[in-house]
Amino acid sequence: MTSPSDVEASTETVDRGSRRNQTNDNPSADLVRVYLNGIGKTALLNAEDEVELAQTIEVGLYAEYLLENSQEPLTRAMKRDLKVLVKEGRKARSHLLEANLRLVVSLAKRYTGRGMPLLDLIQEGNLGLIRAMEKFDYSKGFKFSTYATWWIRQAITRGMADQSRTIRLPVHLVEQVNKLSRIKREMYQQLGREATNEELAEESGIEESKIEMLLRQSRDPVSLDMPVGADEEAPLGDFIEDSEATDAESAVVASLRHSDIRTVLDTLEQREQDVIRLRYGLDDGVPRTLDQIGRQFGLSRERVRQIEREVMSKLRDGARAEKLRAYAQ
């Protein structure tokens, strides 16, 4: 009988094997078949079997505790008996795990087609099965397989949240997305059409205001490098507009405007040019206050204001105004 660590190691070996053989014809199906044949050799358990195994596991754990933490000296015979109980407990643990591996496969198959290979789903489910066995309390009267189902599903959905999505989502959100996707498929089969958000909200118990958000989260991301078009030579990113980019016409107009402004300013006295450049941030885009400009040139606030007014008056007259008028329209 294999130990629990052997169960974990075997699933990891199957998982690694699937990655090494991706170039073979349908290697995953072959590995799943081998795995199913292996786990199918252990008979299923009834409720009485589960309780008996759980009791044996509990006794084994207590015996292991006594061996490691006993406050009283243990005789050789006592140690021998305790070691036997530990060994029997570990066998029972392995038996309980192996008898429920088919349950993991059954649940894992329900999550295929969502971005994660079946063997990876099984691996995650097996971790949930081990966790269920560690938490199982036979004295409460639950059947182990019923109790383990919740832990297996939780482990699979969390594994999917961590591994299958390019953009990871919180676990609670993944569970809601999965629930809504399942309901959406079922309602499509019943209605023969896509269900409305209102219908999905009523069926799922999720607020209608959250439905659209969850549906968006359920969509798989698309790479901007994905080839599109008839010849599939151009990447998708080439067809998406950059709303923040400056178009060619705007760039030309901006260049001409700056050139004309420089030409107009060159007709002013140097101090007038400096004051206007600082006042309107023409060089660095940062406008200065009258006080800031006054401190820089040793002028009063009112004198700076006077220079600004004089310049504005000059710019409204003659050729200077004509050159700038086009940009004010």
UniProtKB/Swiss-Prot annotation:
Chain segments carrying region Disordered: 1-27
Cysteines joined through disulfide linkages: none
DNA-binding region(s), residue ranges: 290-309
Gene3D superfamilies to which the protein is assigned, alphabetical: RNA Polymerase Primary Sigma Factor, Winged helix-like DNA-binding domain superfamily/Winged helix DNA-binding domain
Any one GO molecular-function label of the UniProt entry: sigma factor activity
Record keywords, A-Z: DNA-binding, Sigma factor, Transcription, Transcription regulation
InterPro entries in UniProt: RNA_pol_sigma-70_dom, RNA_pol_sigma70, RNA_pol_sigma70_r1_2, RNA_pol_sigma70_r2, RNA_pol_sigma70_r3, RNA_pol_sigma70_r4, RNA_pol_sigma_r2, RNA_pol_sigma_r3/r4-like
Short motif (Polymerase core binding): ranges: 120-133
GO biological processes: DNA-templated transcription initiation
PANTHER family hit by this protein: RNA POLYMERASE SIGMA FACTOR RPO, RNA POLYMERASE SIGMA FACTOR RPOD
Protein name: RNA polymerase sigma factor SigB
Lineage, top ranks: Bacteria, Bacillati, Actinomycetota, Actinomycetes, Mycobacteriales
